[in-house]
């Protein structure tokens, strides 16, 4: 049985060893939260998402994933939290995304972006652009992201 933690910060910091992981961002909403980690900060980034919940005044780790997406908050509701995250271009300080026809902007930092929508139905957000040195630059298409990821894997394997 997980005894939980007094604070969300304690729960987040206990998820991975601090010497080998970097906390990129945390978003809290009532008794739920989600954090984005870089689990390989000294090399090619490896982002990882972890959900947290508070029950009986104690924070505990919930599900986790190496991909963004929608996560239900309660079996009694169709609403949940949607995340969209990934690598940001060098020098990017903002990200622009579109969800349900609406445009959203959020900070990009530490080479990553992290967008969070709470109390939403399952839908997909699309990243459209990054602000780099004051100028908005179109985000790569999904196929371009996949090619970049394949290149990163090849470099990591030395092939």
Q: Which residues fall in each region the model found?
A:
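Long, contiguous interaction/targeting segments characteristic
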Residues: 1-72
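Well-ordered beta-strand positions
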Residues: 27, 87, 107-108
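Short beta-strand-to-loop capping motifs
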Residues: 37-39, 88, 118-119
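Surface beta-strand/loop "capping" patches
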Residues: 67-90
């Amino acid at each position: 049985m997980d005894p939980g933690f007094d604070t969300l910060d304690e729960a987040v910091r206990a998820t991975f060893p601090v010497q080998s992981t970097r906390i990129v961002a945390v978003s809290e909403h009532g008794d739920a939260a989600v954090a984005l980690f870089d689990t390989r900060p000294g090399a090619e980034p490896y982002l990882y998402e972890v959900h947290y919940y508070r029950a009986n005044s104690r924070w505990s780790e919930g599900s986790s994933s190496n991909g963004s997406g929608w996560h239900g908050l309660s079996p009694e509701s169709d609403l949940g939290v949607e995340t969209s995250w990934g690598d940001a271009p060098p020098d990017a300080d903002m990200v622009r995304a579109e969800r349900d026809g609406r445009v959203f902007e959020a900070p990009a930092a530490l080479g990553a972006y992290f967008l969070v929508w709470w109390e939403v139905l399952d839908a997909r957000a699309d990243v459209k652009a990054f602000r780099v040195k004051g100028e908005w630059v179109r985000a790569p298409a999904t196929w371009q992201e996949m090619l970049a990821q394949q290149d990163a894997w090849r470099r990591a394997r030395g092939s």
